[in-house]
Amino acid sequence: MSFQPTPEDRFTFGLWTVGWQGRDPFGDATRPALDPVETVQRLAELGAYGVTFHDDDLIPFGSSDTERESHIKRFRQALDATGMTVPMATTNLFTHPVFKDGGFTANDRDVRRYALRKTIGNIDLAAELGAKTYVAWGGREGAESGGAKDVRDALDRMKEAFDLLGEYVTAQGYDLRFAIEPKPNEPRGDILLPTVGHALAFIERLERPELYGVNPEVGHEQMAGLNFPHGIAQALWAGKLFHIDLNGQSGIKYDQDLRFGAGDLRAAFWLVDLLETAGYEGPRHFDFKPPRTEDFDGVWASAAGCMRNYLILKDRAAAFRADPEVQEALRAARLDQLAQPTAADGLDALLADRAAFEDFDVDAAAARGMAFEHLDQLAMDHLLGARG
């Protein structure tokens, strides 16, 4: 298998990823700003399928209408020249100080109304550029202290905002769905809708739940100590995996945004295995930050590494699934039984079945090993290149 990416792999990057200048709470930028046009050109050369953007990534905050149109025109020309697409867009409701207490859930009503108008304006541009998904990350929607935010009221305002955006998209006839991106904390001390499970539950309360799904990010779920492939599996099970952000994270700490494959490599293996076998057809979107130690050569090497690592893991996962010994081990671990209904014969038959309870040999069942360790070692062998 070739590990050279092509547009058919559907790899995408945010302008803010390779464009991150390395500025953090403890240090200034280590790289100059990157022109979005150059980003499009370089990512196309690397084999990417598309780019994504926050409104302020493409059009600097405070630009005049004339300046705005100029930025859009240059960006569109770069897309046309390279064949790159814009599958997703989003709104920056976190950088400007006006959003210090959030956008959709700010206590200040005027700020909430401004946040909605800013979002609607970029939805128009997203639709114009052909985006099919609109991500919403509420990085400032939260609090640091208990009395600062009535969470029930804040969730009401969050629901109101998404319902209004759904109403707008429907009225305009846009072929666009929303993907909520959970995160437990950072930059706020505690962020609303902190995990995939919280977001899935919230979506069911919206007026048009069919328009809303999730955009889970590797590092965000792992910051909460959760199993990312399990969260993705539940989102797929619910039919709500509308988008995904791929990166690397090493345990419960700040949001590292490492290139994909760095950090928890085992989780990355199982994630790719899941995406490639579960029928996920969306972009494989990288939301990472090249370390501030790197110059631009390092930036592009990091971006290329994201795609290469995904393709290597895809190859390893396919070899794992095709291995006859693995298939035998899967049966020994009774995965085929898990796929069978527990009581397809119905409740009455279950209650009448003495073998299910009265005559069930609990001790014999308890003594049966599950053979999980052998199966897991086969996975490790494939991941580490010792098999296949």
From Swiss-Prot:
<comment type="function">
    <text>Involved in D-xylose catabolism.</text>
</comment>
<feature type="binding site">
    <location>
        <position position="181"/>
    </location>
    <ligand>
        <name>Mg(2+) 1</name>
    </ligand>
</feature>
<keyword id="KW-0963">Cytoplasm</keyword>
<feature type="binding site">
    <location>
        <position position="220"/>
    </location>
    <ligand>
        <name>Mg(2+) 2</name>
    </ligand>
</feature>
<keyword id="KW-0119">Carbohydrate metabolism</keyword>
<dbReference type="InterPro" id="IPR001998">
    <property type="entry name" value="Xylose_isomerase"/>
</dbReference>
<feature type="active site">
    <location>
        <position position="57"/>
    </location>
</feature>
<feature type="binding site">
    <location>
        <position position="217"/>
    </location>
    <ligand>
        <name>Mg(2+) 1</name>
    </ligand>
</feature>
<keyword id="KW-0859">Xylose metabolism</keyword>
<dbReference type="InterPro" id="IPR013453">
    <property type="entry name" value="XylA_actinobac"/>
</dbReference>
<dbReference type="GO" id="GO:0009045">
    <property type="term" value="F:xylose isomerase activity"/>
</dbReference>
<keyword id="KW-0413">Isomerase</keyword>
<feature type="binding site">
    <location>
        <position position="257"/>
    </location>
    <ligand>
        <name>Mg(2+) 2</name>
    </ligand>
</feature>
<dbReference type="InterPro" id="IPR013022">
    <property type="entry name" value="Xyl_isomerase-like_TIM-brl"/>
</dbReference>
<keyword id="KW-0479">Metal-binding</keyword>
<dbReference type="GO" id="GO:0000287">
    <property type="term" value="F:magnesium ion binding"/>
</dbReference>
<comment type="subunit">
    <text>Homotetramer.</text>
</comment>
<feature type="binding site">
    <location>
        <position position="255"/>
    </location>
    <ligand>
        <name>Mg(2+) 2</name>
    </ligand>
</feature>
<dbReference type="GO" id="GO:0005737">
    <property type="term" value="C:cytoplasm"/>
</dbReference>
<dbReference type="InterPro" id="IPR036237">
    <property type="entry name" value="Xyl_isomerase-like_sf"/>
</dbReference>
<dbReference type="Pfam" id="PF01261">
    <property type="entry name" value="AP_endonuc_2"/>
</dbReference>
<keyword id="KW-0460">Magnesium</keyword>
<feature type="binding site">
    <location>
        <position position="217"/>
    </location>
    <ligand>
        <name>Mg(2+) 2</name>
    </ligand>
</feature>
<feature type="binding site">
    <location>
        <position position="287"/>
    </location>
    <ligand>
        <name>Mg(2+) 1</name>
    </ligand>
</feature>
<protein>
    <recommendedName>
        <fullName>Xylose isomerase</fullName>
        <ecNumber>5.3.1.5</ecNumber>
    </recommendedName>
</protein>
<feature type="binding site">
    <location>
        <position position="245"/>
    </location>
    <ligand>
        <name>Mg(2+) 1</name>
    </ligand>
</feature>
<dbReference type="GO" id="GO:0042732">
    <property type="term" value="P:D-xylose metabolic process"/>
</dbReference>
<feature type="active site">
    <location>
        <position position="54"/>
    </location>
</feature>
<comment type="similarity">
    <text>Belongs to the xylose isomerase family.</text>
</comment>
